[in-house]
Amino acid sequence: MTFPIRRAWGPAAALIACALTLSACGDEDAADNSPTFVNTEARGTADPLYGKETTSAAPAVSSAPPAASSAPSSSTEPPAAAPSGDVQAVLDRIVAEHGDVGIAVSDGTTAIEAGRTAPEAAWSTSKVPVLIAANRTGAADGQLVSSAITYSDNEAAKAAWAALGEGAAAAQATQSVIAEGGDTATQVQSQVTRPEFTAFGQTMWGVANQAKFMAGVRCVEGAQPIIDAMGVADPAQAYGLRTLPGALMKGGWGPSLAGGYDVRQMGIVQLDGHDVAVALIASSPDGQYASAQSVRTSMAEALAQTETQWPSPAC
């Protein structure tokens, strides 16, 4: 069965309330929110999955043009893999320049990572495997996929999770997708661990394993509609990896247990004319969502301006 979801941005009063204070909002899994982006991931009542990651107010996006070409690679052969030390040095430099961040790239088999590499809450990036799993069962029509992936609508993602049976059944179906993509280590959370957020949004997913998954996702059965939706830009989320030409990506955001605000992105982007599977995590220096957006955009610019032989995705 399908769960058609109509984009409803919510009452104006709710948006204004969220815009006035971060504490009044939930979060991504709660509802991607912040004073700048009013997203249900930080809303509490809209868990990156209890509500809808609705955004308002334009995000801070750098005006500097990305160095990567927007044209797809014309090469029929993937570039030779760079010595891991070269790419490692690039990632280490980006981390050193941006503080409390993590980054990883992968070819699907191995990953090169730097900074915050321990598994942390996936927030709405977990919607990618959830929607792929739902699509496999025929429960995710085009409108549901677009709502949950392009616009990070939490209600749409919750509908997909429910269609999978919720709890252990949904977690197993979602985990099978992640494993098929190349990440056999991550365990999908089946139970709610933070009352204001969804179970799957609190899946502990490290940047290295996210990059591995993205390197193999195009070979995963039933993934294409979700990948297509990842390539459609939502103007309210135009920061970080989304600033790079042709990016296929999904973001997620929410409050950390330490009291900060985390923003995550994973995707396939073009660097130096070639596809690269990458995952990022950053915390805002002042606890504000908008600040974390700026950090993510700066990290993306640093990737685009670097010339090296990045690892090529397996798919």
Give names to the regions the model predicted.
Residues 96-119:
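Short, conserved catalytic-motif segment at the N-terminal edge
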Residues 119-139, 148, 278:
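Active-site SXXK
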Residues 75-81, 113-120, 144-147, 157-165, ...:
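Second-shell loop/turn segments in exported
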